[in-house]
């Protein structure tokens, strides 16, 4: 069970200033979350393999493929400053 003091303590750790209404609301909401987590711990998970993903699929990214890009001249013509090879940007690190 989450108490008002628990919410105030966590808010203080997070450097949050909560109103009275927010403290009451957070006490109820966090209490409901803890209650739900406790219900989950009652589930019989014997024989169920642990998993890191909900679905049994991995590496679903597309493969790397070289594709045509804009011509260098087209890109450089839109740059405020360039040296015919690269875009020049202001120096920001000494």
Swiss-Prot record:
Catalytic activity, as annotated: L-glutamyl-tRNA(Gln) + L-glutamine + ATP + H2O = L-glutaminyl-tRNA(Gln) + L-glutamate + ADP + phosphate + H(+); L-aspartyl-tRNA(Asn) + L-glutamine + ATP + H2O = L-asparaginyl-tRNA(Asn) + L-glutamate + ADP + phosphate + 2 H(+)
Which Pfam families does the UniProt record give? GatC (PF02686)
For molecular function, the Gene Ontology terms on record are:
asparaginyl-tRNA synthase (glutamine-hydrolyzing) activity; ATP binding; glutaminyl-tRNA synthase (glutamine-hydrolyzing) activity
What keywords does the record list, in alphabetical order?
ATP-binding, Ligase, Nucleotide-binding, Protein biosynthesis
Answer yes or no on keyword Transit peptide: no
Cite a single GO BP annotation.
translation
Enzyme class, first EC level, given as a word: ligase
Q: Which InterPro entries match?
A: Asp/Glu-ADT_sf_sub_c, GatC
Role description: Allows the formation of correctly charged Asn-tRNA(Asn) or Gln-tRNA(Gln) through the transamidation of misacylated Asp-tRNA(Asn) or Glu-tRNA(Gln) in organisms which lack either or both of asparaginyl-tRNA or glutaminyl-tRNA synthetases. The reaction takes place in the presence of glutamine and ATP through an activated phospho-Asp-tRNA(Asn) or phospho-Glu-tRNA(Gln).
Subunit comment: Heterotrimer of A, B and C subunits.
Question: What is the similarity comment for this entry?
Answer: Belongs to the GatC family.
Protein name per its UniProtKB record = Aspartyl/glutamyl-tRNA(Asn/Gln) amidotransferase subunit C
Specify the species. Caldicellulosiruptor bescii (strain ATCC BAA-1888 / DSM 6725 / KCTC 15123 / Z-1320) (Anaerocellum thermophilum)
Q: Which gene encodes it?
A: gatC
